[in-house]
Design a protein with these regions (language model features):
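Surface-exposed, charged secondary-structure patches
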Residues: 39-102
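Residues that flank catalytic or metal-binding motifs in active/ligand-binding sites
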Residues: 34-36, 78, 109-111
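Non-catalytic cap/lid and distal C-terminal segments of serine-dependent acyl enzymes
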Residues: 24, 74, 107-110, 137, ...
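A short, polar/proline- and glycine-enriched secondary-structure boundary/capping micro-motif
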Residues: 51-53, 102-105, 133-141
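Short, low-complexity N-terminal intrinsically disordered segments enriched in polar/charged residues
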Residues: 1-33, 142-144
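Hydrophobic pocket/interface hotspot
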Residues: 15, 30, 38, 91, ...
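Short beta-strand edge/turn micro-motifs at domain boundaries
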Residues: 108-137
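Short beta-strand segments enriched in hydrophobic/aromatic residues
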Residues: 19, 34, 95-97, 128-129
Length: 144
């Protein structure tokens, strides 16, 4: 059963749970967290040197994760700053990815999450993220 995110803390925990797991994991809980029109957009450097988002639907993201293949991947938000107004929230979160739940982080980055409260629960409209690189380390103010 998927957890309903009635608070932003619950939304972050549910997102970590939905993203984490084997590549072929059932993503129905992820689907419950996202609005139907939600987009998942990693920012990456293109061969021409320009950084740009690559916008995916949940189905496209799920297929990309499946194709990448891994036994288990664990995501954990290590620092989250939330700004809210009415039914709108912006979550700026630093995340870590691990190949083993208790192993060292293999990837870190920043998520920019737009969420909407529908009167009962928080749901995600957009996740835009960028992975940390040697030339763009995560600033200290975003680290735990």
């Amino acid at each position: 059963m998927c957890a309903e995110a009635t608070t932003l803390d619950e939304l972050i925990k549910a997102l970590d749970d939905a993203v984490s797991g084997p590549a072929d994991k059932d993503r129905s809980c992820m689907r419950e967290l996202l609005l139907p029109e939600a987009r998942l957009s990693p920012i990456s450097k293109h061969p021409d040197g320009i950084y740009a988002p690559h916008t995916l639907t949940l189905d496209e993201w799920t297929e990309a994760v499946r194709k990448r293949g891994h036994d288990v991947l664990t995501e954990h938000q290590v620092k989250v700053k939330a700004e809210t107004y009415g039914h709108l929230a912006h979550l700026w979160s630093t995340y870590e990815l691990r190949l083993q739940p208790d192993g060292p982080p293999t990837v870190r980055g920043i998520n920019s999450i737009q969420a909407v409260f529908d009167g009962k629960r928080w749901r995600i409209l957009e996740i835009l993220w960028q992975v940390e690189t040697p030339d763009q380390p995560i600033p200290e103010k975003y680290l735990p």
